[in-house]
Amino acid sequence: MFMEFSAGLMPLETALTQMLSRITPLTAVETLPLVNCFGRILATDIVSPLDVPGFDNSAMDGYAVRVADLSADKPLPVAGKAFAGQPYQGEWPAGTCIRIMTGAPVPAGCEAVVMQEQTEQTDDGVRFTADVRCGQNIRRRGEDIRQDAVVFPAGTRLTTAELPVLASLGIADAQVVRKVRVALFSTGDELQLPGQPLEAGQIYDTNRLTIHLMLQQLGCEVINLGIIPDDPGKLRAAFIDADSQADVVISSGGVSVGEADYTKTILEELGEIAFWKLAIKPGKPFAFGKLSNSWFCGLPGNPVSAALTFYQLVQPLLAKLGGNTASAVPPRQRVRTASRLKKTPGRLDFQRGILQRSANGELEVTTTGHQGSHIFSSFSLGNCFIVLERERGNVEPGEWVEVEPFNALFGGL
């Protein structure tokens, strides 16, 4: 059962722990060609079918030698050539060297490859101008990956760092966890679609676009259900429709004090819901629970609050549900602030900041300016969150603070 936290403010860490403890990763699997696997999560371990490299080969353009042939300190005649895809054929006469190119198989008996920059051409052959040690400039079979080794475990997110490795193993396709299906809608009579004229008291629905884009960035399958008016019957129908299609249902708006009475009644009828007041700023109103078939996350209506709670809570939830074993909790680091930061003790505060190097080369952070929960431009101006502890008050320039650099959801790395 969920605990009810409406009487107090729940710490972010507690909320995240409660959420993730309930989530079991999806088990449905798809087999896709590598070109369609970018951003997908491996469903099974990748075991190497072969050694990489598959044979001893040269790491340099140069000359393959036997170390004993160099003891007389005389030029060595060139007995032949070896290229990538065209190895040296035949016997290798004693007292000679073989011209070899990068990636070419080293001939049997080769003990070292001498780079061409450490040689001189003479009428009698090739003179070697530097000391030579056994094994130099030779890439050994299996040096990178051994046959039967687990290359990537299940739960790995496949990117341009992993997919070329699979191709190098001769693997053409991979088993991946199916995409998480997320149904998304906004609530409120005050919302209007961008491109349409605003009537008195209306605002444009930006939250749904924000969340849709972040869901796409995370590789989810998005079911966009539009704007749902403040009508209990239509809202109930929207939840039933969303629950029938999705693994996760996300709504924006309708979870703040004074807004959620009928929303809460509907959700408690359809599932098991905990409405939380989180001890964070912005983003205090947030809801999480379980409908008949799907998980539910209710985001605040203020744009910055909605984006922040998605980033801090929904992003890790989706990662675990999708089978991603890497931590989705944003990493933090300590830097000095160059700005005065206004803060009232009582809640964990996520202010938007600009992380950059100062004139002396040290990392420092400055504020983006006004930190209102409606100032969404602070995300485009900034590149990090400045994370101020719950008990902390105003911060003066030069004090140490924690920052979370934005990841790709907000244009970061």
Swiss-Prot record:
Catalytic activity: adenylyl-molybdopterin + molybdate = Mo-molybdopterin + AMP + H(+)
Sections of the chain in a coiled coil: none
GO molecular function: metal ion binding; molybdopterin molybdotransferase activity
Cofactor remark: Binds 1 Mg(2+) ion per subunit.
CDD domains: MoeA
Pfam families: MoCF_biosynth (PF00994), MoeA_C (PF03454), MoeA_N (PF03453)
Keywords, alphabetical: Magnesium, Metal-binding, Molybdenum, Molybdenum cofactor biosynthesis, Transferase
GO cellular component annotations of the record: cytoplasm; cytosol
GO biological process: Mo-molybdopterin cofactor biosynthetic process
Cofactor requirements of the protein: Mg(2+)
Known EC number: 2.10.1.1
Pathway: Cofactor biosynthesis; molybdopterin biosynthesis
Function recorded in the entry: Catalyzes the insertion of molybdate into adenylated molybdopterin with the concomitant release of AMP.
Family from the record: Belongs to the MoeA family.
Entry protein name: Molybdopterin molybdenumtransferase
